[in-house]
């Protein structure tokens, strides 16, 4: 049985003969990179598993490693692009740096909204253990990013959150659909992102500025210092 046939069989077992209406198999290539983000920079391999962080209505029928075709998609799929930092939701003993893993894969699964209700929001793709060769997947760190600041603009009927992130990228990386960032360092402001109907738009709710390596290191140093003091600056 080929790798493709093994994957088809795994999907059929999980979702029945109508699986092709619920998921699409994607072939890996240099033009279809998939990314995974993590606070852990020492992951040697990714083993597909049943996630404990699923949106309401998301399929629990098959173990997988969740990825996205873009960094923002990973962040949205991660479930928080900033507010959790206000509530000390993450381990305060770490500097909460997000590491970007570019995944190695031959075949991936693009679920439909029937399986992942927010797939249009995150562009989630699954890496599935369908054979001996896909029991684990390798990823290479190609960049990192961290939240530097959260500003809040108070309005009459609510408030707007503005998240300032800094990224250092070792290779060309897709941040959102239609925006590939060249290797280098960037300051990215994400404005009031939230809700499945959110439409990211550069220049509107996403502002990207290329910065120097020295500028990145300066803000990274301040970030680590502020974490050690258990506060954001």
Model features per residue range: what roles?
Residues 2-30, 57-63, 71-233:
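Conserved NAD+-utilizing ADP-ribose enzyme module
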């Amino acid at each position: 049985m080929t790798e493709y046939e093994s994957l088809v069989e795994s999907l059929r077992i999980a979702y029945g003969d109508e699986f092709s209406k619920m998921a699409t198999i994607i072939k890996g290539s240099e033009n279809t990179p998939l990314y995974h983000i993590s606070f852990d920079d020492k992951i040697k391999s990714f083993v597909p598993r049943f996630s404990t962080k699923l949106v309401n209505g998301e399929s629990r029928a098959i173990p997988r490693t969740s990825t996205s075709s873009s960094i923002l998609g990973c962040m949205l799929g991660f479930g928080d692009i900033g507010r959790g930092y206000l509530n000390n939701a993450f381990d305060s003993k770490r500097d909460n740096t997000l590491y970007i893993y570019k995944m190695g894969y031959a075949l991936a699964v693009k679920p439909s909204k029937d399986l992942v209700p927010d797939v249009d929001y995150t562009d989630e793709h699954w890496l599935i253990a369908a054979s001996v060769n896909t029991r684990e997947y390798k990823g290479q760190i190609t960049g990192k990013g961290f939240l530097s600041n959260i500003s809040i603009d108070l309005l009459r009927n609510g408030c707007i959150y503005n998240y300032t992130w800094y990224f250092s990228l070792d290779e060309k990386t897709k941040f959102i659909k239609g925006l590939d960032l060249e290797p280098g360092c960037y300051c990215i402001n994400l404005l009031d992102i939230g809700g499945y109907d959110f439409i990211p738009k550069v220049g509107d709710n996403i502002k990207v500025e290329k910065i120097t390596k020295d500028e990145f290191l300066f803000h990274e140093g301040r970030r680590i210092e502020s974490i050690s003091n258990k506060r954001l600056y």
